[in-house]
Each structure stands twice: as C-alpha cells, then as structure tokens.
C-alpha cells in the first residue's frame, strides 16, 4: 500500500511497501514576470509563493502534481489581477510568462505557457529555444557558439512567440539579436553553458534602461 503525502505543492513524500502503482512524479512549474514596472502578490492554489513578484523575477521551481492548478496574482499598485488554470501533465516542466497585451478594453494581463514535453535532445546533444516577450518589432535572432563556427537561426522571433527546441552540441552558446537585414547587435545574451541532455530557454524581455534584457530558464537537466 502506498500513502502519498502532498505538502502544498512543494514536495511529495510517500510511504511505500513495494506494492501498487508508482505514485505520480509531479512536474516543475516556474513563473516569469515580463511586465516592466508591474509587481504582483503571486499565489499557486491559494498559497502565496512570492509577495513581490516584479519584472524579471523567475520563481524557483514549484513541484505540482498532475491535474488543474490555479495561478493567481494581485497587483501591488492598482486593481489589476489575474486568475488562470494550468492543466499539468506528469513529468513535464512548465514556464508561465506573465505579460500584458491589448484587448477590447485596453491593456490586459495575459499568460504565455511553454512546456518541455517531447522527446528531448538527441543523444549527445543539448537543446536551446527562445521565448520572445519583448514588444520591440523588426528583430531577428540566432544562437552563436562561443569560440566556434556554430550558428543556429531562431525561426520564430516575435512578441509572445516561443520557438521550438533546437539541438546543439554541448558547449557555450550566446543568443544574438539584431535588426532585420542588419549586422548590428541589439542584445547579446549569454554565454549559456549546456551539457548533453540539458535543455534551456532564453527569455527576451523589454527593459527600462535599454531596449532588451534577458533571463535564462532551466528546462531539462
């Protein structure tokens, strides 16, 4: 008989006598705040996980069991709020991006969700992808291998787009963002060090002092 004990989304322990099906492994959830100047009181399933969830903040991984989970935020400066439901599968890592967009009533808070479901990197390879949550238009991006000749274009690079994972050799890689049809560098993000079997997401964000900034989100280890 198994008697799993769930500690409010943060841990899973079980007493196991060796019979019955294996308990769910759970998934890892991270949230990234991409709205300059905004801050929220962030809760997952009613439990406050960050009382000052502000621009550029990436939460530590939160373990969630398969099923529906409520993600809530209340602005610390006005009446803005969000209340979303994430349907989590087992053994899948999720990134939820808190962003703003334009709706029928003006600016609204919206979510972007990315997961690492899929086969993962090929044997001996790592994987990289880009999540673009900057509103700067007219840009292109590619990954460049540090000290090598490797270069991998990013196929989807526009506001709220999350590219597919691209397999790359292990090593140090940087994301280079330029204006379309130009050789300038708007953002150089990295280097990002990856070993075989790892997957990483580079999130591109707007920035107050400059046009762009970035955050690195671990996916698979």
Q: Language-model features: where?
A:
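Sec-dependent bacterial lipoprotein signal peptides
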Residues: 1-13
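Intrinsically disordered, low-complexity polar regions and short flexible loop motifs
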Residues: 15-221
């Amino acid at each position: 008989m198994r008697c799993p004990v769930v500690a409010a989304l943060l841990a899973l322990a079980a007493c196991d006598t060796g019979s019955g099906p294996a308990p769910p492994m759970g998934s890892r959830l991270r949230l990234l705040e991409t709205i300059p100047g905004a801050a929220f009181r962030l809760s997952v399933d009613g439990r406050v996980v960050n009382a000052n969830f502000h621009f550029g903040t990436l939460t530590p991984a939160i373990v969630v069991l398969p099923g529906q989970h409520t993600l809530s935020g209340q602005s610390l400066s006005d009446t803005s709020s969000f209340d979303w439901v994430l349907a989590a599968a087992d053994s899948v890592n999720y990134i939820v991006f808190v962003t703003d967009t334009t709706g029928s009533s003006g600016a609204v808070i919206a979510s972007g969700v990315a997961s690492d479901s899929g086969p993962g990197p090929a044997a001996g390879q790592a994987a990289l992808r880009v999540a673009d949550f900057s509103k700067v238009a007219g840009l292109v991006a590619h990954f460049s291998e540090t000290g090598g000749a490797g270069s991998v274009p990013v196929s989807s690079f526009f506001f709220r787009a999350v590219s597919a994972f691209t397999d790359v050799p292990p090593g140090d890689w940087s994301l280079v963002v330029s204006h379309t049809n130009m050789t300038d560098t708007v953002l150089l993000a990295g280097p990002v060090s990856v070993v075989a079997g790892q997957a990483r997401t580079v999130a591109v964000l707007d920035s107050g002092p400059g046009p762009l900034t970035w955050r690195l989100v671990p996916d698979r280890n």
